[in-house]
Swiss-Prot record:
Cofactor info, note text: Binds 2 magnesium ions per tetramer.
Predominant localisation class: cytoplasm
Family, as annotated: Belongs to the class-II aminoacyl-tRNA synthetase family. Phe-tRNA synthetase alpha subunit type 1 subfamily.
Quaternary structure note: Tetramer of two alpha and two beta subunits.
Name of protein: Phenylalanine--tRNA ligase alpha subunit
UniProt record, GO biological process: phenylalanyl-tRNA aminoacylation
Species for this entry: Francisella tularensis subsp. mediasiatica (strain FSC147)
Localisation: Cytoplasm
């Protein structure tokens, strides 16, 4: 038994001098491996008298347990040391200046379109699209725009050939929808439109959203209620809205909707030309001739339509005074949204 105790003390002394995991494992194999010194001691039990066998077995097991615990403790210390060294090497200096990340965002026109579409989808309107190169028939004739109307003039419209134009509005989508679908109809038609015009409030290409509702017992009061709710939602405030009589060949009666100037709260400023009001959209009850062109019985059904310029609404919502800024790709401007 004394030999076992001496062997244990020797092994523990060697452990105290270990400086690395490799040497530690060598000591483990030397004493606890299959051919280790303490393992070999267990083989001597068979040669001892019966009364001494339990004593030797107990002594060897105590020695092996003590040695294994010491090895485990030493190993844990090495692993903790390695972890601390690794953490020190990978340490992040949080006092250093951060690296800027260029994060993209939606164009203000896209944001405005999404906002418009979201409101009308919540109110049961579907979204319809149509071709940007439109025939004279869908762009003018079916919308009660006669051949002598100024909108057909070369200086107002981009002509592809004698019978096709770059659409001047998305109203053609309304006719196409009525041709393929019977009432009730609730649609909006967003998209690009084109006109021969370019200044701080006009560009040759801009975005428009037109809406159409056709059903039984539809009145101008329904139109006013819907548009008033839309404008309050879009500008996120309770606005004063007025409807002025106007003229559009495809609606009768027709009106233009104005809102109290969002820049000066109706007090009068440069944006509203000191009137206190801003024109935001056109609207009216669908003309019977337009319903007829879409194969809708105007005696049975009524409808209303409206149209708005997306850039115009964007300018008012974000306080932009030059329409051309939307299309100049100036990152100093676009990063603000």
């Amino acid at each position: 038994m004394q030999i076992v105790e001496q062997m244990k003390d020797k092994a523990l002394a060697e452990l105290n001098l270990v400086k690395d995991k490799k040497t530690l494992d060598d000591i483990r194999v030397k004493y606890l491996g299959k051919k280790g010194e303490l393992t070999e001691m267990m083989k001597l039990i068979a040669t001892l008298p019966n009364d001494e066998k339990p004593k030797l077995g107990q002594a060897v097991n105590i020695a092996k347990q003590a040695l294994q615990e010491a090895i485990n403790l030493k190993l844990a210390n090495f692993e903790e040391q390695e972890l601390n060294e690794k953490l020190a090497q990978e340490k992040i200096d949080i006092t250093l200046t951060g690296v800027g990340q260029n994060q993209g965002s939606l164009h203000p026109v896209t944001k405005t379109l999404n906002r418009i579409e979201a409101f009308f989808k919540q109110n049961g309107f579907a979204i319809e699209f149509g071709p940007e190169i439109e025939s004279d028939y869908y762009n003018f004739e079916t919308l009660n725009i006669p051949s002598h109307h100024p909108a057909r003039a070369m200086h107002d419209t981009f002509y592809i050939d004698e019978t096709h134009v770059l659409r001047t509005h998305t109203s053609g989508v309304q006719i196409r929808t009525m041709e393929k679908q019977q009432p009730p109809i609730r649609i909006i038609a967003p998209g690009r439109v084109y006109r021969c015009d370019s200044d701080i409030t006009h560009t040759p290409m801009f975005h428009q959203v037109e809406g159409l509702l056709v059903d039984k017992d539809v009145s101008f009061a329904d139109l006013k209620g819907l548009l008033h709710a839309f404008l309050n939602s879009f500008f996120e405030k309770d606005l004063k809205v007025r409807f002025r009589p106007s003229y559009f060949p495809f609606t009768e009666p027709s009106a233009e909707a104005d809102i109290e100037c969002v820049m000066c709260d109706g007090k009068g400023c440069r944006v509203c030309k000191h009137t206190g009001w801003l024109e935001v959209l056109g609207c009216g009850m669908v003309h019977p001739k337009v319903l007829k062109a879409g194969n809708i019985d105007s005696e049975k059904y009524q409808g209303f339509a409206f149209g708005m310029g997306v850039e115009r609404l964007s300018m008012l919502r974000y306080g932009i005074d030059d329409l051309r800024m939307f299309f100049e790709n100036d990152l100093r401007f676009l990063k603000q949204f």
